[in-house]
């Protein structure tokens, strides 16, 4: 068993924390690795290298590259028969990474070095919710496309009372879903979340079970920015959404119910709230790097 840090000059550049490995068998002159067999895939924050197993014999192969993020030379050792390497914690911002392949025999004599250039996909952005601020709404900002005329006015969604409710039309003539709650804001919004409370009722029908969250800048052209499913179908149950980042500002919003419990052609709800959300964005591809 040999540890990379204890090898001869051919491995001098290897990281001393590399895993131990066995180098045995072939003692002939190692043939240079054919770099033309290597393909690369740019993954999110990673580089995947794949190659055809060399026909030539060798004991192990060293793959070296410079990591511009850590500003360190990195050495990976793979055994014969290995046909791929996943390089983690990489960045698209650095462009080409140069990988140097070198085969070795059991005497740690190395072949000529061959090079392959490959690029990383962008590292994933991390989004962290900082706070939510409830938007105070008035009844004149609310509307629906299918109000039940005998009960459940839409203004009840804002009264803070879970014993009152809003109801779309259950009386004849019924129309099929989808049906919506619309908010016309007096200002623009962007990152947001919603909360609502289901109706206080013993019946099992009419609870929203799936809905689209839609936005519009003009109240005419609508875009779905999130779809919700598995919504609660039980009495006086609070639902709180994850935050939504539509990537644009809007001044009109719809909670568009696409299905309801018991296959109802209507839906009901007790309370509805809309929140502005402050989101912290950590983008590994754009943050300043230490000098």
Predicted regions: what they are:
Residues 10-13:
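C-terminal motif of bacterial Sec signal peptides marking the signal peptidase cleavage site
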Residues 15-57, 112-137, 277-289:
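Pro/Thr/Ser/Gly-rich low-complexity, intrinsically disordered linker/stalk tracts
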Residues 55-76, 209-215:
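Extracellular low-complexity, O-glycosylation-prone stalks/linkers
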Residues 75-82, 231-233:
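Short beta-strand segments within Ig-like beta-sandwich modules, predominantly Fibronectin type-III
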Residues 87-115:
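Beta-strand-rich modules
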Residues 119-186, 199-205, 280-291:
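Disordered, acidic Ser/Thr/Pro-rich linker "stalks" and the adjacent N-terminal cap
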Residues 189-203, 255:
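A short beta-strand element within beta-rich, extracytoplasmic domains
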Residues 204-291:
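Trp- and acidic/polar-enriched beta-sheet ligand-binding modules for extracellular glycan
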């Amino acid at each position: 068993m040999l540890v990379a840090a204890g090898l001869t000059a051919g491995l001098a550049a290897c990281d001393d924390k590399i895993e131990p490995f066995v180098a045995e068998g072939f003692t002939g002159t190692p043939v240079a690795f054919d770099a033309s067999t290597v393909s690369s895939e740019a993954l999110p924050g990673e580089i995947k290298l794949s190659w055809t197993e060399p026909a030539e014999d060798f004991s192990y192969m060293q793959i070296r590259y410079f990591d511009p993020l850590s500003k360190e030379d990195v050495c990976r050792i793979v055994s014969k028969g290995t046909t791929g390497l996943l390089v983690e914690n990489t960045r698209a911002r650095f462009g080409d990474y140069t990988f140097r392949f070198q085969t070795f025999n059991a005497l740690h004599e190395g072949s000529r070095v061959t090079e392959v250039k490959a690029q990383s996909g962008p590292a994933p952005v991390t989004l962290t919710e900082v706070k939510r601020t409830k938007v105070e709404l008035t009844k004149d900002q609310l509307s629906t496309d299918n109000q039940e005329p005998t009960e459940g006015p839409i203004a009840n969604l804002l009264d803070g009372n879970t014993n009152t409710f809003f109801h779309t039309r259950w009386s004849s003539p019924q129309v099929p879903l989808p049906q919506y709650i619309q908010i016309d804001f007096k200002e623009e919004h962007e990152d947001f979340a919603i909360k609502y409370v289901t109706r206080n009722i013993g019946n099992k029908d009419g609870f929203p079970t799936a809905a689209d969250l839609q936005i519009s800048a003009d109240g005419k052209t609508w875009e779905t920015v999130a779809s919700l499913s598995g919504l609660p179908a039980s009495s006086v149950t609070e639902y709180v959404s994850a935050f939504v980042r539509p990537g644009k500002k809007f001044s009109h919003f719809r909670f568009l119910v696409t299905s309801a419990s018991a296959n109802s052609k209507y839906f009901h709800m007790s309370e509805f709230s809309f929140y502005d959300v402050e989101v912290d964005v950590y983008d590994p591809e754009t943050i300043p790097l230490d000098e």
